[in-house]
Swiss-Prot record:
Organism: Rhizobium johnstonii (strain DSM 114642 / LMG 32736 / 3841)
GO MF annotations in UniProt: NADH dehydrogenase (ubiquinone) activity; NADH:ubiquinone reductase (non-electrogenic) activity; quinone binding
Record's subcellular location: Cell inner membrane
Protein name: NADH-quinone oxidoreductase subunit C
Membrane topology designation: Peripheral membrane protein
Keywords on record: Cell inner membrane, Cell membrane, Membrane, NAD, Quinone, Translocase, Transport, Ubiquinone
Subunit details: NDH-1 is composed of 14 different subunits. Subunits NuoB, C, D, E, F, and G constitute the peripheral sector of the complex.
EC class name: translocase
Amino acid sequence: MSEALTELASYLGEARGNLIAASQMKYGELTLTTTGENLVALLTFLRDDAKCGFVNLIDICGVDWPQRELRFDVVYHLLSPKKNLRIRVKVATDEDTPVPSACPVYPGADWFERETWDMYGVLFTGHPDLRRILTDYGFEGHPLRKDFPTTGFVEVRYDDAAKRVVYEPVELKQEFRNFDFMSPWEGTEYVLPGDEKAKQ
């Protein structure tokens, strides 16, 4: 499998190297990194080329790297049923730079891009219906960003007396506590008889 992916990586470098910023084989998986400007052209080539045949878009997801200038990675997972191969295509972007929508190439990208926008705040240009898909309409923020508070901003519950869903400020039942204990799995500092070599 990884031999076929290595051959594919060299073929893509020759055929469309201008669309690929980086190519990486790691753990038997091929990851192509491209730019937003080249994304649609690369996805179209991967779908239409006879040696590729990546006709299935399995998933699109986001990754948040807050310490980087281009904070987000948008990751496309593709499948070629004829070749029995999977690859990953990555595009890096920031909070203000939109990524071109993959919907013209893979119509199934619609909900994946909506989810990525809803969870991370990554904008997609040319998307037919970019709106929230998992969170509520009035939701503030994007919950999978690393800077989103783990408690959220509001608490949502059904009020049986009012017969409707109500939003309330988050009220923590106890103060934040930091449990900083030694792990019982780290072991002790002393050496038992017979373990002298293991501690060296």
